[in-house]
From Swiss-Prot:
It comes from Acetivibrio thermocellus (strain ATCC 27405 / DSM 1237 / JCM 9322 / NBRC 103400 / NCIMB 10682 / NRRL B-4536 / VPI 7372). The RuvA-RuvB-RuvC complex processes Holliday junction (HJ) DNA during genetic recombination and DNA repair, while the RuvA-RuvB complex plays an important role in the rescue of blocked DNA replication forks via replication fork reversal (RFR). RuvA specifically binds to HJ cruciform DNA, conferring on it an open structure. The RuvB hexamer acts as an ATP-dependent pump, pulling dsDNA into and through the RuvAB complex. RuvB forms 2 homohexamers on either side of HJ DNA bound by 1 or 2 RuvA tetramers; 4 subunits per hexamer contact DNA at a time. DNA binds at K310, R315. ATP binds at L20, R21, G62, K65, T66, T67, E128, D129, Y130, R171, Y181, R218. This is Holliday junction branch migration complex subunit RuvB. It is found in: Cytoplasm. The gene is ruvB. Residues 255-330 are annotated as: Head domain (RuvB-H). One of its GO terms (biological process) is DNA recombination. Keywords: ATP-binding, Cytoplasm, DNA damage, DNA recombination, DNA repair, DNA-binding, Hydrolase, Nucleotide-binding. Its EC number is 3.6.4.-. It holds the Pfam family AAA_lid_4. Homohexamer. Forms an RuvA(8)-RuvB(12)-Holliday junction (HJ) complex. HJ DNA is sandwiched between 2 RuvA tetramers; dsDNA enters through RuvA and exits via RuvB. An RuvB hexamer assembles on each DNA strand where it exits the tetramer. Each RuvB hexamer is contacted by two RuvA subunits (via domain III) on 2 adjacent RuvB subunits; this complex drives branch migration. In the full resolvosome a probable DNA-RuvA(4)-RuvB(12)-RuvC(2) complex forms which resolves the HJ.
Amino acid sequence: MEDRLVGCRLSEEDVDEVSLRPRKFGEYIGQTKVKENLMVFIEAAKKRNEALDHVLLYGPPGLGKTTLAGIIASELGVNLRITSGPAIEKPGDLAAILTNLGNFDVLFIDEIHRLNRSVEEILYPAMEDYALDIIIGKGPSARSIRLDLPKFTLIGATTRAGLLTSPLRDRFGVINKLELYSVEELGQIVKRSARILNVGIEDEAAEEIARRARGTPRVANRILKRIRDFAQVKSDGFITKEIARTGLEALEVDEIGLDAVDRNLLMSIIEKFGGGPVGLDTLAATIGEEPDTIEDVYEPYLLQLGFINKTPRGRMATKLAYEHFGLKYE
C-alpha cells in the first residue's frame, strides 16, 4: 500500500527525484541545526586533513537522509558510494565495497538497521581502526590477517534507530535526528522544485501543497508533479491555488494531508475498537498493513498532528481525531 501519493517510501515514480535534490548546503532547506552542525564538522575535518567522523542520520522516511549524504560528500569533495543494509548479504560483499573506497570517501548505507550480524561485525574494526580482519583457512590452521583500509566516512541512515545494536550505534561520532518539516519550509521546497521543473506556481498554491505534504519533502515533490499534470490539462500550465485545491481533492488528500489509508487507520481505531487502546499487531491486521509500516510511515505524522496516542496498552485515537471527522468524543 506504499504506492499511495502521500506515502513516504521511495517509489519507482520518484526516480527523477535526484534532479530535485540540492547538492550543496546553500541549497538545502530545513533541518537548520543539523545542517549548521554538519557544516562545522566538515570544515574542521578538511582543515585537519582527516576523514569526517562517521555519521548516523535517523528519522521518518522521505526527510532527506540520502540527500544529506550526497551533500556531505560534495562539500568534502570526495566520492559517494551508496548501498543499503539488505543489499549487503555477506561479509565478502562489504569487504569488496570497503576495499574499493578512496581516501576520505563517503560510504552511505541506507536501512543500516537491516544489516545482518556477521556483516555488522566486519564494520566494527573498519569504523574504529580503518582495518579489515580476514580469516584465512579453516579449523586449527585458520589465521587472521588485518588489511588496512582507506580512511573513510560511513553515513548510516535508518528509520528505526532503536533497532541498532549498541556496539554499532556507539561507533558513530555524529548522530542526528531529522525532524518533520514546517509548512513554511515545505513551501520553499515546492517553489524551488517548481523552478527546476519549469512550472509556474503561485505562493498560495505552494503553501496549499505544503500544508498537505505531511511534513515530508518527498511527498511535497510528488504532489507537485501530480498538480502540474492537472494544471497542464485543466488550465494553461500555471499552478494557481484553485488548481492545487482541485487536484488535491481529486487525489483524495484532505486539508491536513490525510489520505484514504490514514482515514481508514483512524476510523478503525474509533469505530472498531471504541477509540482504543488497540495493540499494534491487531491494528495492522485490521487494515492489512505490516506493524513496521504503521510505526515508520503512518504514525510519525499522526503523532505530530496529535491524532493518536501510543500507550503501553496500544494505540488510542485522541479528541482531535474525533473532531477532524466531526464525531463526538466520549
